[in-house]
């Protein structure tokens, strides 16, 4: 016998305003982070090209003649100290806060210190002055990342400086051979798209934290 009960021809419509699942929020958060990073790099590249065009951004190698040294002894000029290696260009730090100072104005993205340390140097840091400033401070301090053999790179991010102070060691009594300080060293263009250590941490964890807070906000909103 034929069943005459009414049948459902169409499925029930999906509930309007259905919240996104946590996985979807997480994907959206990371996609937004990638877009923000690309915009940041492209804007920074445009600013860099503008400074190159007007001549305020140049690549320059500073030698010992361009720099001032504080709390250093030059082995070449001191008969009481003997360099660990029989070659010129070696300095000895006389306390735990030696300084290499450059006085000048430039627009800088990165600074590279090429130096050989005969002993472990501890931390290597750079301080910078902005226009109108005369005193170095901890708020304008950049720690070095080791970018090659006897090579330390400081990422300033693109700003105008009127002076630099490099602290090549933090322990004192370290023989150091200074091979040069390079302002805005030439780098492959694609490296601009590669985040540094701190930026990697931000890109990895900030979207996850943002997605978690978004999930909590959605739950609270739909419970009301």
Give, region by region, the residue ranges found by the protein language model.
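Juxtamembrane interface at the cytosolic side of transmembrane helices
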Residues: 208-224
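Glycan-recognition and processing domains
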Residues: 13-105, 180-200
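Short, hydrophobic beta-strand segments
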Residues: 152-160
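Short proline/glycine-enriched turn/loop motifs at strand-loop junctions of beta-rich domains
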Residues: 117-122, 159, 171-172
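N-terminal Lys/Arg-rich, disordered targeting/topogenic segments
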Residues: 1-22, 223-224
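Short beta-strand-plus-loop segments that form exposed binding edges in beta-rich domains
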Residues: 165-174
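Extracellular ligand-binding interfaces
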Residues: 73-153
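Short, conserved beta-strand segments of beta-strand-rich sandwich/propeller modules, principally
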Residues: 110, 161-163
């Amino acid at each position: 016998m034929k069943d005459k009960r009414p049948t459902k021809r169409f499925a029930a419509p999906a509930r309007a305003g259905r919240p996104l699942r946590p996985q979807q929020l997480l994907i959206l958060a990371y996609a937004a982070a990638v877009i923000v990073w690309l915009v940041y790099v492209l804007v920074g590249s445009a600013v860099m090209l503008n400074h190159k065009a007007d001549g305020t951004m140049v690549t320059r190698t500073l030698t010992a003649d361009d720099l001032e040294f504080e709390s250093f002894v030059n082995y070449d000029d001191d008969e009481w100290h003997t360099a660990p290696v029989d070659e010129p260009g070696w300095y000895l730090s006389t306390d735990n806060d030696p300084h290499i100072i450059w006085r000048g104005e430039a627009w800088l993205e990165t600074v590279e210190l090429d130096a050989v340390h005969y002993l472990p140097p501890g931390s290597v840091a750079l301080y910078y002055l902005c226009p109108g400033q005369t005193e170095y401070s901890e708020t304008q301090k950049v720690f070095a990342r080791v970018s090659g053999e006897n090579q330390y790179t400081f990422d300033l991010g693109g700003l105008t400086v009127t002076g630099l102070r490099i602290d090549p060691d933090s322990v004192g009594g370290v023989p150091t051979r200074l091979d040069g300080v390079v302002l805005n060293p030439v780098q492959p263009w694609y490296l601009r798209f590669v985040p540094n250590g701190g930026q990697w941490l931000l890109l990895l964890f900030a979207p996850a934290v943002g997605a978690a807070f978004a999930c909590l906000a959605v739950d609270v909103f739909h419970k009301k």
